[in-house]
A protein has these predicted regions:
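An N-terminal domain-start capping segment
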Residues: 2, 78, 390-391
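Sec-dependent N-terminal signal peptides of Gram-positive bacterial secreted proteins and lipoproteins
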Residues: 2-22
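Active-site-adjacent loops and short helices of periplasmic peptidoglycan-processing enzymes
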Residues: 21-200
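Domain-terminus/edge residues, biased toward the C-terminal soluble/receptor-binding domains
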Residues: 180-410
């Protein structure tokens, strides 16, 4: 399985190098000296200043190069802009163009002040051709102001799990405010793409090759072509977004699916002019490494639950003074036992029973005592609660007198 996947991606990237010149001119002329052998070892000599390869299913980082370093990320910002817009406003909303939106620098659609567009149409302009003016129009519609939309972006980034992301502009143009410079990290950017590909509308937009739309009166019509060249060079590409500014350099984030495995690659600072092609060779190395080395494995292990001492516990009159024990119960389904995670050869999931050696009475049946936890590289990946299989009463004068009274009269 590993070797088949590796050959598939290597063949695809080889075709990419041979045909890309006809797709987007100079940007995709990948040097013929790129090593096309399967990536077995961890990628080395990446061009990107910061990079991450993530398991799109679990969110686990499989490889990183300075993945937590904050850097400018240019138009890859638009992935989050698109998602926040999709989640906050319906696609048939009318978006009115402001002077601020119309005056944005290239790359832009050429919006004019006062024009109206459907939000959905502008999202295609945003993601397919990375137009800066449509990003501002979308931001002002969804967040009232660019600043308001930036707060929405940063709030969403935190909800997704980003640790060091601060977005100031919806289009990713370099900017700075009282919170610092516009930035993210490779790991955060991968998390954002991992979240985005769960949205079916986002996937549909990202995979559309060509799209035509008009402003609402029909006076002007536009056609946009998807600039994510990887879509035409490899099967299984789910989404991708390029970016460039003078501070960020060339950036890229993509998601790719092969034989049920989903990988997310993010690259920051991946060369400056004239090195537009660096992002493609780095992407190839990371995807090859993931496809070749990682496969899904079940990780369920039968837990060992030892007896738990119940202090001050009592079961009946005959056992007064004896130690009382109980066992925990962990309920799992057949689906739980078949759960899988991407593992590299030599990696193993560790199962730990995290319950106390003793508890104090009273204990109620079904009371949570602890958990069965599964760890990979010291990080918790799954857990199941452990409950008391029966109740244990606490011995006391009241309990004793009630038992004596009950036994005497019955």
């Amino acid at each position: 399985m590993r070797h088949i996947a590796a050959v598939t991606i290597v063949t695809a990237v080889l075709l990419f190098t041979q045909t890309s010149a006809s797709v987007q001119g100079g940007e995709n002329k990948i040097p013929q000296m790129v090593d096309m052998t399967p990536a077995i070892e961890e990628p080395s000599e990446l061009h990107a200043l910061s990079a991450a390869l993530m398991d799109g299913d679990s969110g686990r980082v499989l490889y990183e190069k300075d993945g937590k370093t904050p850097l400018a990320n240019a138009s890859t910002t638009k992935v989050l802009t698109c998602i926040v817009a999709l989640e906050s406003s319906p696609g048939d909303d009318y978006v009115q163009v402001s002077q601020n939106a119309a005056s944005q620098p290239e790359v832009k659609l050429g919006l004019q002040k006062g024009e109206q567009y459907y939000l959905e149409d502008l999202l295609y302009s945003l993601m397919l051709k990375s137009h800066n003016d449509t990003a501002i129009a979308i931001a002002e519609h969804c967040g009232v102001t660019v600043e308001g939309f930036a707060r929405m972006l940063n709030r969403k980034a935190k909800q997704i799990g980003c640790k060091d992301t601060c977005f100031i502009t919806p289009n990713g143009l370099d900017a700075q405010d009282e919170n610092g410079k516009h930035h993210t990290t490779a790991e955060d950017l991968a998390l954002i793409m991992r979240y985005a590909i769960k949205n079916k509308t986002f996937l549909h937009i990202s995979q559309t090759r060509d799209y035509t739309f008009s402003e609402i009166t029909g006076k002007r019509t536009f056609s946009v072509h998807n600039a994510n060249a990887l879509l035409d060079m490899m099967d299984g590409v789910l989404a991708g977004k390029t970016g460039y500014t003078s501070q960020a350099g060339y950036c890229y984030v993509c998601a790719w699916e092969e034989e049920g495995k989903t990988f997310v690659v993010s690259l920051l600072g991946c060369g400056w002019p004239n090195h537009k092609t660096y992002k493609w060779s780095d992407t190839k190395k990371l995807l090859s490494y993931g496809a070749y080395n990682y496969d899904y494995e079940t990780y369920w292990q039968e837990p060992h639950t030892s007896k738990i001492l119940v202090t001050d516990g009592v079961e009946n009159m005959q056992n007064i003074g004896e130690k009382v024990y109980l066992r925990g119960k962990c309920s799992v389904t057949s689906e739980d036992r078949e759960k899988e995670i991407l593992l590299k050869k030599g990696e193993a999931v560790t199962c730990k029973t995290e319950i106390p050696q003793k508890v104090s009475a009273p204990v109620l049946k079904g009371e949570k005592l602890g958990r069965i936890a599964y760890y990979l590289d010291g990080k918790l990946i799954d857990s199941y609660p452990v409950y008391a299989e029966r109740s244990v009463e606490k011995i006391s004068f009241k309990w004793y007198t009630e038992k004596v009274f009950h036994d005497f009269f019955h």
